[in-house]
Amino acid sequence: MIINQIYSIDSCDDVELNIKRGSKLEFRLTYDDSKEIEAIVCIISGLGGDIDDNLYIEEYCARNYNVAVLSVNYHCIGNRPQTGASFYINELDRLILKTSLEAIGIQLPVDMQNLKTYDEFYCVVDFVNKFIEKLKKEKELSEDYCLYLSVGLEPTKNEYQNYGIMQAIDIINAILYININLPFKVSNMSTVSRMGGGIKTILIGVSHGGYLANLCAKISPWNIDVVLDNSSNVTLDNDLWRFIGFGREIDYVKYCSVGITYMFKNIKLAAFDKTYWTTNKQSPYYFSNARKIVREPLNKEHLKIQSLYPKPKYIAYHSKFDQYVLLEKRENYFNILRELGFEVDFIKITDEKEIDGKFIKNLEHGCGIPMKLLIKKHLLQILKEPLQDKICKKEVSYKCDELVYT
């Protein structure tokens, strides 16, 4: 029988920002209780997704393979409207609204600094949207004019965007919890125990989910056997740091976390994750270069340290035409891994001829590869491969400028 079990446990506090966590870590485990389980498959959701999106794939895997499937609602996963986030405004949003209206000569009998809630903000913006439409009809503004404003995204569970570290630790903690509290029968349990680690663990993710899979392998390499990754970022370069949420401090139009274009005809909202990270160098929450590089799987010195531990296998896909992540970054990452003795299978999609309409559907970010087919193509072979020896010191440290992360 297929079992779907939801867990809620304590996980990590935010050690970087010295913030006590108030929320529980939630995850779901799906397995067939009639089978002896050979591996844990962890499907990691990307931005805009959560475990509710994974149930069909989880049950497919549990029915067709001898695996238990883990899906984790990691820290700040509810940071998009479709996963429960709500809009809010802060002082900077009010200032942007005020100065933007002044720039096009719109004066309202409202003190913008008195706007306390998003609902109040929405009413003003709705009025401005209609006023802009009137100005367009009167030829005072061009038809293609669009006003850009900013708003914040308040995640569920009163969380905030730490980005990467707490999310990866949550995934690792969920894996460790299941290994300690196995609810299913394990195939070759004596071999698993002898090899110094838990049951074979496979991380699968697309985009941000793939990024977190690689980050888990960096933080806790002895707990990960295979990373199966489609189109992830391996640095925060190419403006990818904007997903942290402090981009409104620099250029709110260029560096938003996500654009909201469906609410108003004449206004686009640049939305930003709620975060304590800031560009203010005087703040204890300053996002320094050290904070950046610890979050980047692509760091040669860090990879050298990781190579001293049990080595996960990497299987990855990436398009030459990916609009977010440069293929060259990924090539560099996997070339370094190979040099350091990691097993890597890196599939580069570089030509329209590779589009088959079923597995590879386009040349854009993610290549349209269905998660089910990605799993179907690789999982059986992964399960046939021997469990690696994980006997090692279960602690790793990475020097990041003036900081050391352990």
Residue ranges and their predicted role:
Residues 177-248:
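Primarily recognizes the serine-hydrolase "nucleophile elbow" in alpha/beta-hydrolase
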Residues 90-191:
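Alpha/beta-hydrolase active-site loop
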Residues 40, 66-75, 202:
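A fold-wide structural signal in alpha/beta-hydrolase
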Residues 252-406:
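Serine-hydrolase catalytic core
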Residues 37-47:
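Short beta-strand element of the alpha/beta-hydrolase
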